[in-house]
């Protein structure tokens, strides 16, 4: 498949988007939304804020059910693959932050070129007419 995009970047919802891009040879680097569960409005807000507070510990909440899972309460993101349940957050946050800083900087640099964004549209949250809230947001913006 020939395309005119320099980059094809996952905007997430869940990990499978990046996995499928990789499976078909369309993913050339790791980006911030690849391996997490992400709220679409949170993704847009995070990009507009240039990833400020992405891993700010003030907004990180550890799951009671699975101690490896953390939620960013500002952007409504869930990190499932980055943390070790046997270490306290403060001992592992620097390493995770460095990884996401590289990915965020790569993202902001990459989107200056021709970029195709791919996102799985969640239908888990619907309005009273049974239409996906994410799809409505996209249509309205």
Say what each PLM segment does.
Residues 1-141:
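Extracellular glycan-modifying ectodomains
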């Amino acid at each position: 498949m020939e395309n005119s995009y320099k980059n094809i970047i996952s905007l997430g919802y869940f990990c499978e988007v990046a996995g499928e891009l990789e499976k078909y040879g369309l993913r050339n680097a790791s980006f911030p939304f690849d391996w997490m569960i992400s709220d679409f409005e949170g993704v847009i807000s995070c990009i507009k804020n240039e990833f400020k507070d992405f891993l700010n510990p003030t907004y990180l909440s550890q799951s009671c059910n699975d101690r490896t899972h953390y939620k960013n309460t500002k952007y409504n993101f869930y990190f499932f693959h980055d943390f070790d349940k046997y270490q306290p957050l403060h001992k592992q946050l620097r390493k995770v932050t460095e990884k996401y800083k590289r990915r965020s900087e790569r993202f902001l640099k990459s989107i200056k070129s021709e970029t195709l964004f791919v996102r799985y549209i969640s239908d888990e949250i619907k309005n009273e007419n049974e239409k996906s809230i994410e799809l409505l947001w996209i249509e309205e913006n």
